[in-house]
Structure formats: C-alpha cells, structure tokens
C-alpha cells in the first residue's frame, strides 16, 4: 500500500492565506531538508530554531521555525522535521516545489499510517485522530479525545486477550487430552468465561448507535402543515436565513438542511414541505420527501398553529417528537399547554416566547440519544460494529459439547474480529479503507 522506505512530505495546515503554515517531513532522510534549504545552524532535537530557508539558487524563500523530532520519539516513529513558515500561498508553493526535488509527496493519511505501522497508535486511536480533526462540536471533540487516549483499544485488547487465554487452554487439550479436559470444573470455567464475553459484547452492541450518532449528528426534522412557521423556526435555530419565509403556503418544496450545535451536540436540522392535500406534482414530491425524512429522523419537532389549538388531534404520540404551538404571539406565559393529552410548547419567534425552553428540550433529547457523557467506551464506526457483530456470532456458536477443533476455530475467529478493530491483522484492504479518508499531511 505504501513504501515506508521513502521520505515523505506534505503541508499539514490548510492551503491559503494564514499567519503560519506547517510543513511536515518524515522518513529516514528527513534531515536532508537541512542541506537542501542551506540551513547551517545546529538543530537541537525538540527545540524550535529560527532559520532562513534558501532555494537552489541561494535565493531567500522565507525565514521560519524548524523542529526536529528524532525517531522513534515522533508522531510517525520516524525522523520528522516540521517547518513553520509564513502562511503565504507563494511561500508554501515554493517550499513544496523544493521538497519535491528530494522527497515524495505524501498520500492522504500516510503520516498516520506510518504511525500505526510503527506502533505509535492502534487503528481506533488513528480513527479518533480523524474524528478530532473533523469535530465541529464540544461533545464530538470529547468523544474523539477519549478514543485517541486508547479507551476502545484497551477494551477490545482485554476481550481479545481473554479469548486467547481460553483458546490456549483448549489447544493444550489437543496436545494433552488426558490432562485439562478431564476436569469438569475446568470445562465450566471456560464456558462461563465465554458466556461472560457474550454478554459484554451484546451490551456493547446494544447502545442505540450513540457513538456513531455523535460522529454523524442527530437528525432533527421540523414538520407540520403549510404556513405554520416551520421555515421561521428553522432559520431561528440555524441562526441565519436559509429558508424563504413567506405568507404563501407551500413555499418550501425541497428539504433544506443546516448543521447546528446545541449544547455541544451536533444537530442536522431539516426544514420540510408542509403536509397537506395537493394536486401540484412538484409539491406532492416535496410532501413525499418530507414524510420520508420525518420517518427516518432521530427526533421531530411538530408544529401546530396556536390559533387552531382546540382542534389539534395527534394520532401518534411518541417520545421522539417535540410538539410546538407556533406563532404564539399572544400567549400570556410560556408554560406547556395540554390538549387532548398532548403537552405542547407555545413558541413565538417574533416575541422570543418559548424559544429558550425549546432549545433546552432539544438538548435534553440529544443527551438521551447520545447517552449524556457516558464513561464506558462506545462504538463510533460501522466498521467496529461489523467486526464486533461477527465476533459475537462466533462466540454464540461456541458449545462445549462440540468437537474440540470447532470450539478452537470459533474462538480463533472471534479473536480475529476483535483484532481487526484495533489493527492486529494483516489485511491491507482494511488499512486502505481507514487511511484513505485522511487529509494529506495527516
């Protein structure tokens, strides 16, 4: 997948105008950069040194900071040079052109791949780094930091080691059948240990996709009849004018989306077409999409017009819906109103009535979905879930009365799946899938 004998380089910061740009070099010949840029100063490891950088014709390119991290005490485990220069597009281009004369441009994720191959991180920690880079909210960053710290790796390594210990006892029987397997108490211990792992993995999988939801965002859909104030509420929560607000019913036809942050939780908010009877084929398509998105959503905010409150009739009441009386401009207080057994929150965007309470309700619902800062490690990717599910299936097939070879194979396959999550395998396509999603320079 990659030639780790090559010395690689890349821009680690975003290309564009900025105060500082960081260029990273990693490999056995990283120190060649000093000669190439005519740097004469002594570079002390892990100290910032101010230097002038010159091109081949001895023209000054820029002055900046150079830091040398000798192997193995670096991000990649190799010799690493970091150049901190002015964030000028021209300067960056010139330096990258100069480096390309002696080194190879890194592929996306190649620095992290080398860190993994050199034992600096396991796969879940590497994925945590990617999640931290992509994090847009406090809770996303918090989850990523936990993963980088090795939460998942420690959990899965512990389970895997327990399986290996069990398998070693069973393998011993193959060589010495007259010893271990004759003890009934030993059989019971092995069976109890396997069943304990089955319960732990089942509980781990039965987490309502909390980790994945936090990575991807909680899907919230605003629904209701036409002209009930959906777009006004959408713009208010998004804190910008995205949807067209009009007195004419049926203005919103397609689904509009906004990524917002409520209480540190990532929310994907959708404004949808008003639900009503219509003969307009375009509006009907919008209504169809609205119903589909509402069905798929993690949470719904259903709006009813305040002036029609005596006639409200909701056939299905569920905990994943917040019921709102919109355009409640004349309400005396913002206490919930109960109609036909349903609690509805009066909200007026115009007068700021009920808006804070609505945001608090959304945050409470998000905390319920995300498991409000749980201490236990959570699955954060479908890749993890797939391997854990396969490991569980192998363990559920475990039967102490089966032939010894089948028992051993089920345990081996379960341990393999756990190892696949953290990267204790030699399956190149899995590694390619993980690291191809990184940006260049990481």
UniProtKB/Swiss-Prot annotation:
Cofactor(s) named in the record: K(+)
Pfam family, one: TrmE_N
Cofactor note: Binds 1 potassium ion per subunit.
Family annotation (PROSITE patterns): G_TRME
BP-aspect Gene Ontology terms: tRNA methylation; tRNA wobble uridine modification
Cellular compartment(s): Cytoplasm
An example Gene Ontology molecular-function term: GTP binding
Enzyme type, top EC level: hydrolase
Alphabetical list of InterPro entries matching this protein: G_TrmE, GTP-bd, GTP-bd_TrmE_N, GTPase_MnmE, MnmE_dom2, MnmE_helical, P-loop_NTPase, Small_GTP-bd
Principal localisation: cytoplasm
Positions of Mg(2+) binding: 231, 252
The keyword Kinase is annotated on this UniProt entry: no
Enzyme Commission no: 3.6.-.-
KW Hydrolase (keyword) present: yes
Record keywords: Cytoplasm, GTP-binding, Hydrolase, Magnesium, Metal-binding, Nucleotide-binding, Potassium, tRNA processing
Biological function: Exhibits a very high intrinsic GTPase hydrolysis rate. Involved in the addition of a carboxymethylaminomethyl (cmnm) group at the wobble position (U34) of certain tRNAs, forming tRNA-cmnm(5)s(2)U34.
Quaternary structure and interacting proteins, as annotated: Homodimer. Heterotetramer of two MnmE and two MnmG subunits.
Name of the protein this chain belongs to: tRNA modification GTPase MnmE
Organism: Wolbachia sp. subsp. Drosophila simulans (strain wRi)
Gene that produces this protein: mnmE
